[in-house]
Amino acid sequence: MEAARCAPGPRGDSAFDDETLRLRQLKLDNQRALLEKKQRKKRLEPLMVQPNPEARLRRLKPRGSEEHTPLVDPQMPRSDVILHGIDGPAAFLKPEAQDLESKPQVLSVGSPAPEEGTEGSADGESPEETAPKPDLQEILQKHGILSSVNYDEEPDKEEDEGGNLSSPSARSEESAAASQKAASETGASGVTAQQGDAQLGEVENLEDFAYSPAPRGVTVKCKVTRDKKGMDRGLFPTYYMHLEREENRKIFLLAGRKRKKSKTSNYLVSTDPTDLSREGESYIGKLRSNLMGTKFTVYDHGVNPVKAQGLVEKAHTRQELAAICYETNVLGFKGPRKMSVIIPGMNMNHERIPFRPRNEHESLLSKWQNKSMENLIELHNKAPVWNDDTQSYVLNFHGRVTQASVKNFQIVHGNDPDYIVMQFGRVADDVFTLDYNYPLCALQAFAIGLSSFDSKLACE
């Protein structure tokens, strides 16, 4: 009788189970809310590489063919080029690297955009640089300023100080002149874009276009979109690369997606957005990583020489088109990542020299690690400059990048750090701009962009 009295009834068990389920669901909801809050906070992380809206738009002028020579014939660096910090963001961790000669230009509220022709320097700082700046973003946008950091010129501090003491009428006249100048620069950039489209011509054969280096003096402007459809079924996102043309037209170039059931990251690239299999006729190359996910190699659609020794001609064995190396980031440093890109050299006809290693010891990565760089070109990401005013690393993307992200980067050559070989950056949640120049081709540039998406130790 006592045992029956002490035993809990079915109603008590049900209430206890309901309470347990309610608490578990509450914990799951709290964890989901914390995760979403963390992702939003990470997106707004101030230490991410971002375009700084506080510097005036630089004039974009087409480069002459002689300015591209460092990528063809090696030469000594110019004496007037400042090479501080070009080896990556690690230089910013050292105290002696704080005194960089290239500084971001800060536009004070109330002062007009400085003219290009006037240069000035002052020992004292402008008083308005430390003053609060309400609605700074709107004021800068009225001046037509969309990107940041002037790497070529010193900040015009004297001009800023003079603007603080000038009369309102003088300020209005200078503002009008700056607006006219911005309009003329916009028109010039539009003419340059039309000339670039004319030199590129129509893309008739996607495979030939993907393998061919960009024309000298022409910036190929593309957009990369990420399609997350199917991720709920265990599929990886699909990435599409489109060529931007005038009048908001775009032409499909490449598509890529990560393979399933692979020990390492393997991205297959195709010229057919509906067929991303390796057996498809449109398969043109792949991007493969090492086990750590810090080194990547780009191949064309040729045959692996190890698997087909003596069975195929040398002309059909695969080429290595590029190697991408990320410096391992294990200390939690949330600043820009350091990356190196190795590509085959170019001959005197501006064509890529075929690079067909027979084994791993002859690969691009092995030659780069052994410093055997004959007929090879080494590129690296341009080190961003820390801006105390915005508390972030900034690069001048010329208005092509609008959102902060650790994936934003520019690639340059050591002998000419002002010549942007490639730049990549976020403009929306799943939209990125990808612009590349000679000597890169579309497949190389797309693969470099894909490597930055991979969830690797160097990117965390």
From Swiss-Prot:
Localization, UniProt: Nucleus; Cell membrane; Cell projection, Cilium; Cytoplasm
Keyword Secreted: yes
GO molecular function: enzyme binding; G protein-coupled receptor binding; intraciliary transport particle A binding; phosphatidylinositol binding; protein-containing complex binding
Main location group: nucleus
GO BP field: anterior/posterior pattern specification; bone development; brain development; bronchus morphogenesis; central nervous system neuron differentiation; dorsal/ventral neural tube patterning; embryonic camera-type eye development; embryonic digit morphogenesis
InterPro entries reported for this sequence: Tubby-like_C, Tubby_C, Tubby_C_CS, Tubby_N
Record keywords: Cell membrane, Cell projection, Cilium, Cytoplasm, Developmental protein, Membrane, Nucleus, Secreted
Acidic residues: bias regions: 151-162
Secreted in keyword set: yes
Tissue: Widely expressed including eyes and adipose depots.
Protein family membership: Belongs to the TUB family.
Record-linked PANTHER family: TUBBY-RELATED, TUBBY-RELATED PROTEIN 3
Protein name per UniProt: Tubby-related protein 3
Name of the gene: Tulp3
